[in-house]
């Protein structure tokens, strides 16, 4: 009906996070620009999957790793009146998943299960993972460590495969996730809630600091451009 129901501080562009060491063995390079040239469409991606398999690696961990990349590129909604419509791009994902499973290009895991997490760690032999920006610091980093932070490990090169990941765009643009802030209906703190929501999602300085503090990607273009053009970086 045109009324705003929530707001968010995040932008959640998708990317492909790959193991530098594996890319170098399979493709002869770990440079993000060069790796992207090998993965810039699905035909090329599938070719690299075959190359990775020949070297003893899986291209993806599980059945649903690539799902969002396909599902974010459909042409129409799932439901039309009382009819459920399966977009051709979804069927491309089904076909690819069957091929990868039959040929051993994936490890038959599912998102968030223990095998999927282990495949991102020191013993993993998976070329890469489709992730959004939040997934790098909130999930992939922790899974990469040999000794978890909770057990005294440090987030630093030398602990597991910390530092062995790089990212590129992958075969198709997509997004994954986004956390939204909503006010409770009937609240008696309207002014305070409005101020909190506006500050967290509209204040350039605050949004820039969120990224600097947590590595979360915020939806303020100017703030993100300033960080991109600075010397800010992550050892991970």
Report the location of each language-model feature.
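Helix-loop-helix "hinge/cap" segment bordering the ligand-binding cleft or interdomain interface
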Residues: 2-66, 78-111, 185-191
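Short, solvent-exposed loop/turn and secondary-structure capping segments
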Residues: 8, 28, 72-73, 140-141, ...
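Short catalytic/ligand-binding loop motif for oxyanion handling, primarily in non-cytosolic enzymes
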Residues: 15-16, 67-71, 136-140, 207-208
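Charged, glycine/proline-rich intrinsically disordered loops and linkers
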Residues: 28-34, 144-158, 226-236
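Secretory-pathway/luminal and periplasmic proteins that interact with or process carbohydrate-rich
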Residues: 53-58, 129, 205-209
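Short aromatic-enriched loop/helix-cap "lid" or pocket-rim segments at secondary-structure transitions
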Residues: 67-76, 141-142, 222-224
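Extracytoplasmic/periplasmic substrate-binding proteins
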Residues: 72, 91-198
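Mature extracytoplasmic/periplasmic domains
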Residues: 174-175, 179-236
């Amino acid at each position: 009906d045109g009324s705003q129901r929530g707001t968010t501080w995040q932008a959640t562009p998708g990317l492909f996070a790959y193991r530098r060491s594996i890319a170098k063995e399979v493709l002869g390079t770990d440079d993000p620009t060069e790796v992207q040239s090998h993965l810039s469409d699905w035909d090329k991606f599938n070719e690299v999957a075959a190359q990775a398999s020949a070297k003893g690696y899986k291209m993806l961990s599980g059945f649903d790793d690539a799902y969002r990349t396909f599902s974010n590129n459909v042409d129409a909604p799932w439901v039309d009146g009382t009819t459920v419509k399966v977009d051709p791009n979804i069927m491309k994902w089904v076909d690819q998943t069957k091929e990868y499973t039959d040929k051993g290009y994936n490890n038959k895991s599912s998102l968030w299960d223990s095998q999927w997490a282990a495949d991102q760690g020191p013993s993993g032999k998976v070329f890469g993972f489709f992730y959004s920006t939040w997934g790098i610091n909130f999930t992939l980093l922790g899974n990469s460590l040999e000794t978890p932070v909770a057990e005294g490990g440090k987030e630093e090169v030398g602990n597991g495969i910390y530092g062995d990941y790089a990212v590129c765009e992958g075969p198709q643009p997509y997004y994954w996730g986004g956390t939204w802030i909503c006010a409770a209906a009937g609240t008696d703190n309207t002014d305070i809630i409005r101020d909190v929501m506006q500050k967290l999602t509209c204040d350039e300085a605050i949004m820039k600091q969120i990224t600097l503090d947590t590595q979360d990607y915020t939806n303020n273009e100017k703030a993100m451009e300033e960080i991109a053009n600075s010397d800010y970086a992550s050892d991970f």
